[in-house]
Amino acid sequence: MQRPIAARGARLTAAFRHAWRRALAWLLRGAALVAVWEALWVIAWGATSGVVGAQTKAAPFEDTLAQRVQACTTCHGPQGRAGPDAYYPRLAGKPAHYLYKQLMDFRDGRRHYPLMTGLLAPLTDEYLFEIAQHFSALDLPHAPPAVPARRSGATAQQLARGQRLAKEGDASRQLPACTACHGALLTGVAPDVPGLLGLSPDYINAQLGGWRLGLRLGAAPDCMALVAKRLGPDDVAAVSAWLSSQRVLGIEASMKPAPGVAPEVSAILARDHADLACAKARAPGQGAAAAPTEAPTEISSKEPSKMLPLVARGAYLAQAGHCAGCHTPRGAEPYAGGGAIDTPFGKVYASNLTPDTIHGLGNWTRDDFWQALHHGRSKNGRLLSPAFPYTNYTLVSREDSDALFAFFQSLPPKPVPTPAHELRWPFGAQWALRAWRALYFKPGTYEAATNKSAEWNRGAYLVQGLGHCNACHAPRNALGASQGGGALAGGLIPMQNWFAPALTSVHDAGVSRWAIGDIVALLKTGLSPQASVSGPMAEVVRGSTQHLNPADLQAMAVYLKDLPTAPSLATHTVQTAPTAPSASNPQGAKIYKQQCAQCHGEQGLGVARAYPALAGNRAVTLTSTVNLVQTVLHGGFAPATGANPRPFGMPPYQLALSDSDVAAVITHIRGSWGNQASRVTALEVSQNRNQTMR
């Protein structure tokens, strides 16, 4: 009797498998869709915990947006997922404007998550919008409820309370229903209201807590902050338990508002926020707004063609000097200052350069500005902190100083006060600054080298003066002064835990053996056949050098190529007989195959203009491993530039890999494919992990 039953069961199982495969093939018909799905699944679920599950074989490289944004899907996955430090919500199918705003808020510091801020820092508004549209358009199957009701631990009374608040609100406490803004099915309303289903209770609790405490901010009027502050702890627990236990029914119906919003709730919204978008747009029976179709544009004060010639020249010089890098904090008013700059001696705050008469340069003259730039003195004669690089700007000509001042005077005045510096005694005292200047500063002007070409001298003027390259690419002493005069011998950037490699060493970042065109390409786009930029240099390329005209880029390249060769601060060391990496470091080889080979290749050859080669890469074999560890831990994108507007991203592995994992994979890379550099220890990784990246 057992055999016939077993045989029949086998036939039924085979029939079920056949039917399931046919259904799946029909659902995923088309090679392109299958490839995208598999790529998302492998990428997303292959890098989450410790040494992650093995990938089988690297897929062929395809230049798609899905490939470019692997830095996103590696953490978020196709469905959202729990991570070691948080819950990463599903991105697929969310309203495009909502996703775009969140990306902007992370990049500009309005939402606080350092990994996201660092990852998005080099990207433009336009690219963020394109990324948002990409994920919004994905129609992937929804996962089961994050926490089914039967396993949530919530009582029936709690779930009923959560359902009532979500669907009806509480007019007596001026609490609108969640459906009033988030749609009848609570799956979002186009163009900018997210869904609330398919999320974990921890994530929902964290977001409501962020709204309550002011850690998460919205554009005025901030309706979510108002709602969150009216919810008690029991309300939050009930709502999160009920929402997280609900199944998502589909995207198609999600972009519609609730069929009927209670009149008293509409009255609450209208009374508390008369201009609140959700109070107006969620009226009963009203259709959803259309999804966005056009990308935003970066905001600038004026087009250069509409400026007076002197002002236009000043705007160009401000970009050459990357003034916005300090004087325009992320998400703040252009050149209005107020941002903190960390130094080994405390915080200094960038000043307001707009013509505001109280907080800015409104009462300054061009002579006052020249005094600050050339002599390091404020309008009232006070000595300025050398965190403002007047030690470089003293080389700027009076004509260029006047042009810069004309540009800053043309800006709209912004009444943004500059906080007082927070320096440890005695570093902010005037007598201490006088002593420092006596040792390390002498006002001067750029003196052209008579034995060099005009092009070389123009490059030297830009690199040594406005570009203030040695502010990063030179070592500093215990008092913060750059060492070696104008030499660009490399050094650790204070408080940023990035190493600016020597521009005078062919083993570090020297370009004496490069073609001029390749140097120009690196400064213009962040990419060249030999290298790509990352970290602070990515921000310099995005905010400064990509905007320089061809003649100035050529001049800088000529000067940099001609720099005298000198020993690097991080002396390049070589192992004469490295052990075979796969035999001596199986852990590193395994992690590389699982996490890195898909993009960088089994032999470390990379993909041109997408993923840098690791074989023979000087950044890999530097004795200072700071940058390499930072890159593995924090990931990142190359800078988005006019010539490379959609750069490829690398996912952060700070949460996915332990210190020993990171040390093992970096050691493998530094000892493979002809690379011969020292091992990296877990202690080195741990020390870098605990430092501030940006």
List the model feature ranges, each with a label.
Residues 1-60, 104, 108-111, 248-313, ...:
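N-terminal export/targeting leaders of redox proteins
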Residues 83-90, 105-152, 189-195, 212-246, ...:
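Axial heme c-ligation environment in periplasmic c-type cytochrome domains
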Residues 93-95, 102, 198-200:
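Extracellular/lumenal glycan-associated surfaces
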Residues 57-60, 136-166, 250-287, 298-300, ...:
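Intrinsic disorder/low-complexity detector
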Residues 400-404:
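Hydrophobic or amphipathic alpha-helical targeting/insertion segments
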Residues 218, 226, 340-348, 423-460, ...:
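Primarily the internal scaffold of c-type cytochrome electron-transfer domains
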Residues 56-81, 149-187, 307-328, 333-342, ...:
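Sequence/structural segment immediately N-terminal to covalent heme-attachment motifs in c-type
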Residues 81, 140, 196, 437-448, ...:
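His/Cys-centered metal/cofactor-coordination and adjacent catalytic loops
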